[in-house]
């Protein structure tokens, strides 16, 4: 056996490790069927100007991305996306939501909607903070 260290991760190597981990996890998880959830707002030209990407898995909705373009910020667009995602998650049987956000992103936004900070990473990546939130639906 040989130990290799790299700063350039090849897709094939990443896929091999991911597939090994996935096989291990699927043998142990009770719910093996995560379902993607994408909600997009498009302009008249079909360009995405705001959107939500997450996944529902068992009791949980995991929020991966929630983004609103500059021109739509502070007009209720983010709230609309979040409410819709939570509604769909409930319909899918979810009881909780989990997300992470940086200090310069939207912690106050999520707190306004009942999300509670579970923990935070200080000095991430250098001087900022990364927060992890949970909400009971």
What are these regions (language model features)?
Residues 98-100, 116-132:
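Conserved catalytic-core motifs of GNAT/GCN5-like acyltransferases
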Residues 56-64, 73, 125-129:
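A conserved beta-turn-beta hairpin within the catalytic core of GNAT-like acetyltransferases
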Residues 89-102:
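Conserved GNAT acetyl-CoA-binding A-motif
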Residues 32-35, 43-45, 52-61, 66:
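A conserved beta-strand-loop-helix scaffold within acyl/acetyltransferase catalytic domains
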Residues 1-9:
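Conserved N-terminal entry element of GNAT/NAT acetyltransferase domains
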Residues 72, 76-84:
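Conserved acetyl-CoA pyrophosphate-binding loop and the N-cap/start of the following alpha-helix
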Residues 17, 110-111, 115:
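Conserved active-site tyrosine of GNAT-family acetyltransferases
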């Amino acid at each position: 056996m040989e130990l290799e260290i790299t700063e350039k991760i090849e897709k094939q190597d990443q896929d091999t490790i991911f597939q090994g981990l996935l096989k291990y996890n699927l043998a142990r998880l009770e719910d093996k069927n995560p379902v993607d959830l994408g909600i997009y707002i498009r302009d008249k030209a079909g360009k995405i100007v705001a959107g939500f990407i997450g996944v529902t898995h068992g009791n949980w909705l995991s929020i991966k991305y929630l983004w609103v373009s500059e021109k739509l910020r502070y007009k209720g667009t983010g709230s609309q996306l979040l409410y819709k995602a939570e509604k769909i998650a409930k319909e899918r049987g979810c009881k909780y939501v989990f997300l992470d956000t940086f200090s310069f992103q939207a912690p106050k936004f999520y707190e306004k909607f009942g999300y509670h900070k579970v923990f935070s990473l200080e000095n991430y990546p250098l001087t900022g903070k990364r927060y992890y939130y949970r909400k009971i639906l």
